[in-house]
Amino acid sequence: MQSEFIHLRTQSSYSFLESALTIEKVVELALLHKMPALCLSDRGNLFGSLEFALYAVKKKLQPIHGVILNIQYDINVFAQILLIAKDETGYKNLLKLSSLTFTKNDRKICDHINFEDLIKYQEGLIALCCYTDGIVGKCLLARKQEHAIMFARRLQAILGDRFYFEIMRHDLPEEQFIENSYIQIASELSIPIVATNKVLFSEKSMHYAHDVLLCISEGVTKEYPDRKTVSENCYFKSPAEMKKLFSDLPNAIQNTVNLRERCYFAAHPNPPMLPNFSTQDISETYLIRKYAKEGLLARLVTKFKAENISREHQEKLKTEYFTRLNYELDIICNMNFAGYFLIVSDFIKWSKKHGILVGPGRGSGAGSVVAWSLLITDLDPIKFGLLFERFLNPERISMPDFDIDFCQERREEVINYVCSKYGNNRVGQIITFGKMQAKAVIKDVARVLSLPYKCADYLTELVPFSAVNPVSLEQAIREVPELANAAKGKGLYNLEGDAELIKLVLDTSLILEGLHRHSSTHAAGIVIAGTDLVDIVPVYKDANSDMLIVGYSMKYSEIAGLIKFDFLGLQTLTVITNCKKLLKEQGIEIDFDDMTFDDNKTYQMLCKGKGVGVFQFESIGMKDALRRLKPDSIHDLIALGALYRPGPMENIPTYIACKHKLQQPDYLHKLLKPILEETYGVVIYQEQVQRIAQVLAGYTLGAADLLRRAMGKKIKKEMEEQEEIFVKGAIANNISQSQAKSIFATVAKFAGYGFNKAHAAAYGVISYQTAYLKANYPAEFLVACLNLELNNHDKINLFLQEAKDNGIKIIAPNINISEGYFSVKSSDTVITHNTKPLIPRLNNEIDIKDTAVKSLYYKDESTIIFALGAIKGVTPNFGKLVTDERKARGAFKSITDFIERLPPKSINSKLLENLIKAGCFDELHDNRLQLFLSVPKLIAYSTSYHQEQESNQFSLIKVSSLSPTILVSSNYADKNTLAFYEFESMGLFISNHPLTEYQEIFSRLNILNTRDLYNKLPNGTNQVTLAGVIQKKDSRMSARGRFVTLVLSDPENIFELTIFSEEVLKDYVHLLDVKSLVVVNCDIVKDEGGIKLTAKSFLSIEDAINNRQFELQLYPQNYAELEQIITLLVSRTGHGYQSNAKATIYLQSKDVKHFVAKITLSETFFLQVQDFEILSQYIR
């Protein structure tokens, strides 16, 4: 392909928020204009270089690698330079120079290289002195021609004939101002000129959208006066346009072609590159065989002891295990993967040695006996029937991939160890790129174009949300009618707004969608290289870390030859670690290494569906499945973990029925019974598919893995080929063709969603471990769970409810008991706290003298003490500060004592308000409302007190002689106010739920609580009436339209319901505020997937009660109390209430000490919320 011009100044969206072009688009544009080559020259980085090279080569376009860098020529003298790789040496130097801009210590000035860096790494590079942004252009703009010539000579001296002057014509004044002088200097110094054009968007019509992109970059609106702009000419000009533009400088056009001919390197894939594990003259093959055999012997000694295996059987097992070990080792060594296994084994052994909990396995790697022997996994693959070929297939060579779960809190320690062992320059994290996806791009563009927030928010809500497959804006406009109308300029149905502006927002968003917006770091991926990373890939450093980060995404890092290791932080392992620590403090040691999975208490708990906090078994549907399954072995837990997914879930009833002998298993063929017996005839695992192919059709396990993959992908051609092989092999095994075809079809159906048994088994073990801890040590386990969820108040509520269900006492937040984190106190633990109110009601002056401290002993029960760090606005560090002060100087005696003893900087109004609302000072002062209203004065007192202490002016004066801190006068808050104080400060109701008072009434009105909902209601579709306090409201969109989810609570639990009907939303909008008390009539669907509630109508609590006739049985203790009841009821018959309202009272006992008042209220009788609080004191 011949061309008369090559673009050298093309930027992609890897120049974040500067270019509106993707890699694919720039290549397509070059091909469209019949260019044989294209230079990608992003600003400051080579993040897209390998992606660009591979895509360009695929499309038969020559890729040229360039980068625009800032270079420091002198103190405070910075300018841009475009560097282009001529050959492989040049590309490697380009990697080093671009990486230096991120890794230099003086990045605070700007991302740049020094002139000395260019001298050091100039080999193989072509340099273009950027036009107005380059050093020569900047000097000319400053009217310093002598300086311009000086810097040009310096660059020419270093680069020789590899140094060019760039010239641009975007019709900008600054370009025209320097052009003549610029060309003159080039001529005098014999420096060739190349014509370039900034390529930031595809065509001139995209200038508007690109301008919006620049505004997004700067965080300003389009009306902002002093913002960055670029010429409308920064588009992908054709060769003809460029020739015409530079018709007076034909050599500048020709030089782009000449320069292209000097470049002959393209970034390419590399084979995997690992560091040498051993620094001595010992082969990795020798080491892995040695360590694996030693490790297997140690594993078997533990196994034989734990399982009490006879000596005779031990020898037989040794032969079986070592045969499998040697088979795996031969494959691993032949594939040259010994080093990989040794590296993984080394950092896992280090972790375990240093007390860092590592998961038993994850993914197919748990199927390897070598991995088990090297302590990479803790799962016996032969015992659990796991296959090595599922992990490493000798018939399909690919890199092994161990994903390792670590205790989340100590994962960084393992990474630091790897860095120290292999070198900081050879270990790195992996970059990820955030893109402008549909919802985000609408928000960005709407902000720039000043679309009202309400309209912008509504627009984004119209885009359906999918975490797995994000919906594009184009797709959303096709599928959501209201969006489609808005895109046509018809505005929004439910909102007033400028229809044309809304259309412009959508049009612009469609253009910018998919562009890179920013970079971040992969959550788990770590690469370890055999050489410095910068020799292979671009690297950079995040501002928050000193660790190198590979500048290619995960996909392109692996293509470049880097080996990825996933260091995953699993929160459950942190729960286990912290629970074991709590137990160790009590002298209880837990060792899971030789666990036999036969604890009856554990299975009894699971059979009751008590899955809260148990790994994998926390969902409502899972808990229901546990109750029906009644698991009694680890194999049941593994199977349920694999089955509980869309697709396989439909086989749960079959598995349960066969387990409980209510149905006969179908093994498909007698030869398959040994394979399917464990799962009652249900094909659950991918390994079962492999074994079926091996036993029935003569496949090798490697070939069977290829069959499994084909079945999973459902590619028709592959399936037809595999079916032919399967049937042919089965016929050779004396199975009829029709039966073979039938079995193939059945297995293929299961294989489509079959689960990796190695992964299921490893995670089943973690499930068992958490269940064991919960069943045997519930308080310690739940405290460990709580302390990882300090900011998740829904989870805290869930765990505390579970604690109550287990008979564990909960101590509300208390400034003299609580710590930064949740804590557990066992029986006979002494808890010291104040018991006497320190301040009389409505007293305006704090009295710190009248204090009584008492010790409480909680016998024969565990107690969980609420964490200060779980209160909103309060951190665990503040909790530690409080705890340390208590340990040093004793319990706080009053709120002034508290304020005086803590540094004033540690206490602010919001923190103090929330501590008060949460009830932390209830035992120091019995009027929470009074303290809350006095916060400003308390904060003022804190400031003045500490100022006086610092000045030492009052060092000899007693505190009581200072000006008194005045509390405002206040009555006591009612129970509901206090309950909502707690909700506002902790996100939950801890001492009293607003609906507690109504439970007796609700039971008479057939209003269910959530305990009944989950435990008594049969499966199927029903209608129920529930009552709850709205705790959270969230509006969402689906393809069918808007819907709202509500999170509510009652005294028993938290539940979620959905409102799909716009009519329901409209009719009851006045009742749907957070903190509203409502009764809801809803449809309920209860099945294996859990419980789904759909709201049909709402009532306020008052209306719900007063619209029904019901009966109350009250127990006044005397005539005075009876008179109070009658007075209350009489008061509700007047004042606008219906005159025919009736309340009938029956005295069932004449004994004055044992009144029983039976009250029947008519449908028209009206009671208020506060009435039930009064009446409830007489309900037994």
UniProtKB/Swiss-Prot annotation:
CDD domains named among the record's database cross-references: DnaE_OBF, PHP_PolIIIA_DnaE1
Function (record text): DNA polymerase III is a complex, multichain enzyme responsible for most of the replicative synthesis in bacteria. This DNA polymerase also exhibits 3' to 5' exonuclease activity. The alpha chain is the DNA polymerase.
Protein name (record): DNA polymerase III subunit alpha
GO molecular function, one term: 3'-5' exonuclease activity
Cystine pairs: none
Alphabetical list of SUPFAM superfamilies matching this protein: PHP domain-like
Subunit structure: DNA polymerase III contains a core (composed of alpha, epsilon and theta chains) that associates with a tau subunit. This core dimerizes to form the PolIII' complex. PolIII' associates with the gamma complex (composed of gamma, delta, delta', psi and chi chains) and with the beta chain to form the complete DNA polymerase III complex.
Organism of derivation: Rickettsia typhi (strain ATCC VR-144 / Wilmington)
Domain of life: Bacteria
Short name of one Pfam family: PHP
